C-alpha cells in the first residue's frame, strides 16, 4: 500500500496540482496584502470611515454600545458587514487578476499559433496512389 501511495504521489499531475495549490496560497497572501494594505486604506479614506473596515457593524441588540467589533460581540448580536466588504473587494481584485492572466495566456497562445507556418500536406501513402492509378485506368477502359 505504501508503494501504491508513492506511485500516486510521483505522478506528474499530482505534483503539478500540489505546486499549483502552493503557488495559489502564496498568491492569495499577496492579494490579501494588496487589499488590506493598499486598497482598503484608500477606500476607507474616501468613504470617511478611516482605514479599517473590520470594525464596521450594526448593533442588532439595544445592549450593544461598544465601538469595536470584538467588544460589541461580547455585548450582544451584531451585523458585522465590514469584514464582508474587505473579503468582497479581495475577491474582485483576485478575479480581475486571474482574468488578466488568462487573457494574457490566450493572447500568447494565439500569437504562437499565428507564427506557426502551415506544414505542407503529407503525400498520400503509396497504396492510395496505386489505388488511384488503378481507378483512373479502369475509368479510361470503360
Curated annotation (Swiss-Prot):
MF term (GO), any: mechanosensitive monoatomic ion channel activity
Pfam (any one): MscL
TM ranges: 14-34, 82-102
Topological category with respect to the lipid bilayer: Multi-pass membrane protein
Localization (cell): Cell inner membrane
Tagged with keyword Transmembrane: yes
A GO cellular-component term linked to this record: plasma membrane
Keyword Electron transport: no
Keyword annotations from UniProtKB, A to Z: Cell inner membrane, Cell membrane, Ion channel, Ion transport, Membrane, Transmembrane, Transmembrane helix, Transport
Gene3D superfamilies: Large-conductance mechanosensitive channel, MscL, domain 1
Family: Belongs to the MscL family.
Quaternary structure, from the entry: Homopentamer.
Function: Channel that opens in response to stretch forces in the membrane lipid bilayer. May participate in the regulation of osmotic pressure changes within the cell.
NCBIfam families hit by this protein: mscL, PRK00567.1-4, PRK13952.1
HAMAP family assigned: MscL (MF_00115)
Name of the protein described by the UniProt record: Large-conductance mechanosensitive channel
Organism field: Sinorhizobium medicae (strain WSM419) (Ensifer medicae)
Amino acid at each position: 500500500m505504501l508503494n501504491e501511495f508513492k506511485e500516486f504521489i510521483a505522478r506528474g499531475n499530482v505534483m503539478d496540482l500540489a505546486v499549483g495549490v502552493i503557488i495559489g496560497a502564496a498568491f492569495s497572501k499577496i492579494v490579501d496584502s494588496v487589499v488590506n494594505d493598499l486598497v482598503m486604506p484608500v477606500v476607507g479614506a474616501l468613504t470617511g470611515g478611516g482605514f479599517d473596515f473590520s470594525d464596521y457593524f450594526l448593533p442588532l441588540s439595544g445592549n450593544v454600545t461598544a465601538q469595536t467589533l470584538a467588544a460589541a460581540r461580547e455585548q450582544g448580536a451584531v451585523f458585522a458587514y465590514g469584514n464582508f466588504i474587505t473579503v468582497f473587494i479581495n475577491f474582485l481584485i483576485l478575479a480581475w487578476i486571474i482574468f488578466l492572466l488568462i487573457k494574457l495566456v490566450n493572447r500568447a497562445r494565439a500569437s504562437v499559433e499565428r507564427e506557426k507556418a502551415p506544414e505542407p500536406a503529407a503525400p498520400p501513402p503509396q497504396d492510395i496512389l496505386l489505388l488511384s492509378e488503378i481507378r483512373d485506368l479502369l475509368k479510361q477502359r470503360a
